[in-house]
A protein has these predicted regions:
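Glycine-rich, flexible loop/turn motifs
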Residues: 81
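Short S/T/G/P-rich N-terminal loop/turn motif that feeds into the first structured element of a domain
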Residues: 1-52, 61-69, 84-117
Length: 117
């Protein structure tokens, strides 16, 4: 399970969402081809207008570090800080446990007992 997950919470400045989405979209191909990249998803906050959460999953933290320092990503970081971001927070985590509705091997025993699985 040793993947590394990066959570990028960003609040985009008023009137800058289209620019931010265009800029982040321009990274898609580079991201897809980055060493160790597994997948990414973006979610929009229901509570805070203009706030997004991007979650990317990587093979390990070394791959995250390489992406962080990739030239086009660095340029996008600077552009975002200077133009698009009102605020942001980055959290890097490794999973404690992961299970699904079907694969319950790592699920807590009390949950499996309650669900009778």
């Amino acid at each position: 399970m040793g993947n590394t997950i990066v959570l990028f919470e960003v609040t985009v400045k008023n009137g800058r969402m289209d620019d931010y989405l265009k800029m982040s979209g321009s990274l898609k191909e580079s991201l897809a081809n980055a060493e160790g990249f597994i997948r990414a998803e973006r979610f929009s906050s229901l509570a805070t207008e203009g706030k997004l959460l991007s979650m990317s999953v990587w093979e390990n933290e070394e791959c995250v570090s390489k992406w962080r320092n990739f030239a086009v990503h660095r340029m996008a970081q600077k552009h975002g800080r200077m133009n698009d971001f009102a605020d942001y927070k980055i959290t890097v985590v490794t999973p404690v446990r992961s299970y699904t509705m079907i694969d319950r091997a790592a699920a807590p025993a009390d949950s499996n007992a309650y669900l009778e699985v």
